Structure formats: C-alpha cells, structure tokens
Design a protein with these regions (language model features):
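Binuclear metal-dependent hydrolase catalytic cores
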Residues: 2-226
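Active-site-proximal loop/helix segments of hydrolase catalytic cores
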Residues: 210-213, 223-262
Length: 262
C-alpha cells in the first residue's frame, strides 16, 4: 500500500512539472511539427491519377459524427472540392491536404448544407496559400448570387486579415471568391466547365425536384472517369452518363427516416 502511495505521489509530481512547463514544451515541439506538416505533400503522395475522397457525408441536420456534403477530387496535380458543407475543409486538413492548394470548388446546387462552408474554404485557401486571385466557384446559374453574398459577408474580415498578416501572406486581391456560372444543361447534354492539363470536368442535369438548378459533375483524366451526383432522385439522365464510367459517387438517403422527421 505504501509503495502504491509513493508511486502515485511521484506521478502527481511529474504531472505537475509537465503541466507547469506546458508552454515551453509546446514551443519546442512546434518547429518540428510545422516542418513535418510543410514537408508533406498529399497530392504528390497519391501520384498522378484521378483520386476521389469524401470530406463530408452528412445532411442538413447536425450530427456528432457527420460533416456536411463534401467531396475531394485530385487530378493533374491539382486539388478540388465538390460542394462545401460544414467542416468539410477541416476534414480535408485532417486527411493531409494543404488547404492553400485548393484550385476550385464545384457546386451541385444551392441547398444550405452544400454551401455553408464556403466562407471558411475561401479564407483558409487564401491565407494558407498567399494567393493573389480569388477562389473560383463553378456552378449552374445562380452561383453568382451565392458568391456575392459570401464575399459581402467576409469583406470586412478580409481587411482585418490583411492588416494583421500583411500583403505577403494575405494579399487583398486574393480574398474571397469568383463565380464561374454555366446554364443548366438539357437532358442528354454535357457542358464542359473546366478543361486544363488533361483534366476535363463536365456538368450534367439531375433530378432534385423541386430544387433547380441541380447538377452532377463528370471528371475525366488520363482515361479514368468519376461521376459525382450531388443530391438527386432517380435520374435517367444520370444513369445514361454513368454507363461505362470507373466510379459513381451517388447520394443515398432513407425515406423512412425522412418521413419520421416530418
């Protein structure tokens, strides 16, 4: 019993010592942690190809273990997001991606849970990469309104960030977002919304009635294809363009759960 008491006392003393020096310990560990983080390039680790990941798979209702809709796409050495639900950008960081490397965001539609993380996405990309041009947000008609709203809401913050961090880290010209809008395609039609370095991104219409516009995106790179549906009911147009592709990322929901929530 006496031996256990002595051990317990020693543990308490050691713990108190560590706690009292916690600031110095953190400062000593910080350079190594920063170096490890900066030296890791997730895109290079993945290699040249078409890579898809989920950075969020929840819905509009809060859930402790779910983040808002968000898909990571890596191709041609570039990093993209498809939809920007809450916490999606933070999950990308946990996945090892450099948030400053985000090339663009593709929006499938304008439900709140698919767009509510956009402000944070644009800010972390800007501050994390020292960009001097805004983040491109691709989407169907109406994306201009979304982007204008977020830019207005974050306008003062961009001034504060620039005043605090300076032009080298946060140039004012790189703050916010730029809308890249396309008409919703007719059924049977693909509209090219991005084409660079061998990567082609095409937009197609899906059925998310009564929400319109609502689109999916088809990614093609080096002979590989991935189709991300966004929110949709059963869609013959989506089925048509999904034939023969390598990967389909499709929405799923429980009608029983939805009915119970009404």
């Amino acid at each position: 019993m006496k031996k256990r008491t002595v051990i317990a006392a020693l543990l308490i003393i050691v713990s108190l010592g560590i706690y009292s020096q916690r600031g110095d310990i953190v400062l000593r560990m910080l350079p190594a942690a920063m170096e490890a983080n900066l030296s890791t390039n997730k895109i290079e680790q993945l290699g040249d190809g078409l890579h898809i990941g989920l950075c969020g798979a929840g819905g509009p209702m809060p859930a402790a273990t779910r983040s808002g809709p968000c898909v990571v796409v890596v191709a041609a050495g570039k990093l993209f997001m498809l939809d920007a639900g809450s916490n999606g950008i933070r999950n990308m960081g946990r996945m090892g991606f450099d948030m400053g490397q985000i090339e663009g965001v593709f929006l499938t539609h304008f439900h709140s849970d698919h767009i509510d993380g956009l402000g944070e996405v644009a800010t972390l990309r800007w501050a994390g990469g020292g960009h001097n041009t805004p983040l491109n947000i691709y989407g169907p008609e109406g994306v201009d309104d979304i982007v204008d709203g977020f830019n207005s809401a974050y306008q003062r913050d961009s001034i504060y960030r620039n005043d605090h961090h300076g032009d080298a880290a946060t140039p004012r010209s790189g703050a916010g977002m730029n809308a890249v809008s396309f008409p919703q395609p007719e059924n049977g039609i693909l509209t090219t919304v991005y084409e660079q370095d061998g990567l082609t991104v095409e937009m197609l219409t899906v059925n998310h009635f009564p929400i319109t516009p609502a689109v999916a995106y088809l990614f093609t790179y080096k002979g590989r294809t991935a189709l991300v549906s966004g929110d949709t009911n059963k869609s013959t147009n989506l089925q048509h363009f999904a034939e023969g592709i390598d990967l389909l990322v499709h929405e799923a929901l429980s009608k029983t759960m939805i009915s119970a929530m009404r």
